[in-house]
Amino acid sequence: MSASATNGTHYEQLHQGRTKMYKSKVDVVLGAQWGDEGKGKVVDMLASDVDIVCRCQGGNNAGHTVVANGTEFDFHLLPSGVVNEKCVSVIGNGVVIHLPSLFDEVLKNEAKGLQHLENRLIISDRAHLVFDFHQHVDGMQEAEKGGKSLGTTKKGIGPAYSSKATRNGIRVGELLGDFNLFSEKFKSIVATHVRLFPSINVDVEAELARYKDYADKVRPYVKDTICFLHTALRNGKTILVEGANAAMLDIDFGTYPYVTSSNCSIGGVLTGLGLPPQTIGEVIGVVKAYTTRVGDGPFPTEQLNDIGDLLQTRGFEVGVTTKRKRRCGWLDIPLLKYTSLVNGYTCICLTKLDILDTLPEIKVAVAYKKPNGEKLDHFPGTIAELGNIEVEYAVLPGWQTSTEEVRNFKELPENAQSYVRLLESELSVPVRWVGVGKGRESIINVH
C-alpha cells in the first residue's frame, strides 16, 4: 500500500465513528471593528429565542446599550440578553469582575425595570476579580505614558489580566472558599502591587471586611459554568455568546498596543467559556455602516473634518463606558476582510445605516496601498506599517432620504441596497440583518 493511500486511510479513520455529543450549537456575536458596533442590540434581538446568553471575556470596560420596550439599559458586565426574562445569563471564566461595579450595575438597571436577576444570572467560579488597586494602577500607568497613553478605560482590566497571567490573581471561587486563605492571598497581591507602585494606598483590613460582605452577596450566583454549559448543550439548549470589545481591540490580532487585554475574537469564546471548537455554530460579525474608535491608536479612514463631525453628531457617538466622543470615519473593507479572516463570520449584521441618510456621496475604503502605490495583500501587523499606508476609496452615491421607518430590505432606497450589497460582495459573507434605528424593531431581516 502506498504512503498516500495509508495516509488517506488514517485520515478517513480519524473521521469515522464520531458520535454527536451535543444536541445544539453555540452561536456567537462579535464586534468586527473597534467596538461600539451595536452588538448589544443584536444580542437582545436574538436572545428572545435562546435559553442562555454568555459573556466570555473583558470586564466592565465594555459598554452595551439595549433599548427594550422604550427603556434604555446600559450594560458593562451583565450580558445584554439579561433583559429577556426567559433566558439565563452567564458570566464566564474569561471575564474579570469588579464586584462593586457589578452590583452597582445591577441596582441601576433594576431601577429601570430589570427583574428576577437572582434566578437567572450565573457567574463562573473561575472568573478573576478586579480590585480597586488594579484600577489605581491602571490610571497611574496611563499617566506615566503621558502623550503616548493607550487610552484605556482605567477600569483595572489590564492590571487584573496581568495578575492572572503572573499567577497571583484571585478568582471568585477563592473568595467563596476559606476566607482566611483569601485574606492571605489578598494581602500578598496587595504587597506585590505596593512594592511596584509605592504611591498606592490600600486599607487592607477595610477591604477584607468589604469583600467578606461581597462574598455573601455574590455566593448565590456562582457555579461551575463549564459543566453548566456542556450539560445545556447535551440537552439541546440554545446558547448565544456576546463578545465584548471587538476584533480590532484583540490583544493578539488588534492594533497592538492600542488594544484591550483579552482575546475579543473567536478564540476568546472557547477559552473564556471552556468550550471546544466543534460546539460553535453561527459566527455573526456586527459591522457599523461607518467606522468608529474610542481612545488612541491608528485609524486609517478617520475623518477629521465635517464628515467626521456629522457622523459623530448624527450617530450620537459617545462611549457608554468612557463618555468620550468617538472618532469617526468611513467604512473600511480591508479591515473587515482581516477580521472576517480571523473570526470566520458566517453572516453579518450591518448597523446604523440610517446615520448615512443625509450624505450626497459616501466613501468606502477598498484597499490599502504602500507609499509607492503598491497594494497590500495583508493587514499591517504593526502600527508603524499601518500608519504609513494610503487608503484607496470607492465613491458611492448617497440616497438622501430617511431609512428610519423602513422595515423591509426591498423598500430601502436603491443606493442603500447597493451599499449593503457592496459589503456582502467584498467580504463574501451574507448580510443577514440591517439596522436603521435604535430599537430592536428597527433591524431589517435581509433574507
Curated annotation (Swiss-Prot):
Binding residue positions for IMP: D36, E37, G38, K39, N61, A62, G63, H64, T153, R167, N245, T260, R324
Residues given in the record as Mg(2+) binding sites: D36, G63
Gene Ontology biological process terms in this record: 'de novo' AMP biosynthetic process; IMP metabolic process
Pathway the protein acts in: Purine metabolism; AMP biosynthesis via de novo pathway; AMP from IMP: step 1/2
Reactions the enzyme catalyzes: IMP + L-aspartate + GTP = N(6)-(1,2-dicarboxyethyl)-AMP + GDP + phosphate + 2 H(+)
Binding residues annotated for substrate, in chain numbering: V320, T321, T322, K323, R324, K325, R326
Textual note on the cofactor: Binds 1 Mg(2+) ion per subunit.
Function: Plays an important role in the de novo pathway and in the salvage pathway of purine nucleotide biosynthesis. Catalyzes the first committed step in the biosynthesis of AMP from IMP. Plays a role in the regulation of adult life span.
Identification of the protein by name: Adenylosuccinate synthetase
